[in-house]
A protein has these predicted regions:
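HTH-adjacent hinge/linker in prokaryotic transcriptional regulators
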Residues: 4, 9-55
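Alpha-helix termination/capping residues and helix-transition junctions
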Residues: 49, 75-77, 112, 136
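NAD(P)-binding Rossmann-fold cofactor-contacting core
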Residues: 74-98
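Short active-site oxyanion
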Residues: 54, 80, 116-118
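Hydrophobic/small residue at the entry helix of a nucleotide-binding pocket
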Residues: 63
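Glycine-rich Rossmann-fold phosphate-binding loop(s) that bind the pyrophosphate
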Residues: 60
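Phosphate-bearing ligand-interacting subdomains
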Residues: 4, 93, 97-181
Length: 181
């Protein structure tokens, strides 16, 4: 497949495709294009999608429930191995075959199951404490749905998901009259 064909599928330019891929090594052959199978394997490895990631979910409220039910996580290699909450009425109940545990067991489970990622779906008031505990237990990254910025060591990547800010960005783009800005 040529860089032009890849570019048209990604709504970008052929030059941008070649430039982006060059950051990760040599791909394809001049005049022949790219082997899609080889490109797929190499990109999956670069993105860390060639393995299963152990994930715990902290927060069994509405956002946590929606995230847990999302089928693409499992299909893409994200295995939710445990759920935690502080609500006594939720502790001990099950979502599918997964039991909701007391958040006091967070560190032990992270260490025991060698958890890679934590999804925080907790109130702002609990986010920093949970993040600190998860980092101390050895987690390697955090997806933060709490409406607050958390502070962790620079070695721990954090992705903040703020739905209100994303809606504001979308409404700004619509107000400005451009979808591609």
């Amino acid at each position: 497949m040529s860089s032009e064909q890849l570019a048209s599928r990604g709504h970008t330019t052929a030059a941008q495709v070649r430039k982006d891929l060059s950051h990760f090594g040599s791909f394809g052959k001049r005049g022949l294009g790219y082997s899609i199978e080889e490109l797929s394997v190499r990109l999956r490895a670069i993105l860390g999608l060639d393995r299963v990631w152990q994930v715990v979910l902290v927060g069994a409220g509405r956002i946590g429930s929606a995230l847990f039910e999302y089928p693409d996580f499992k299909m893409r290699g994200y295995d939710c191995v445990a759920i935690f909450d502080s609500d006594p009425e939720k502790i001990g109940t099950q979502w599918g075959t997964t039991t909701i545990h007391s958040s006091e067991w967070l560190e032990a489970v992270i260490e025991q199951l060698d958890v890679d990622l934590v999804i925080l779906a907790v109130p702002a008031s609990a986010a920093q404490e949970i993040a600190d505990r998860a980092v101390e237990a050895g987690v390697r990254g955090i997806l933060n749905f709490a409406p607050v910025q958390i502070k962790v060591p620079d070695s721990i990547p954090v992705e903040d998901v703020n739905l209100v800010m994303q809606l504001e960005a979308l409404s700004f783009k619509i107000t400005r009259g451009g979808a591609g800005e």
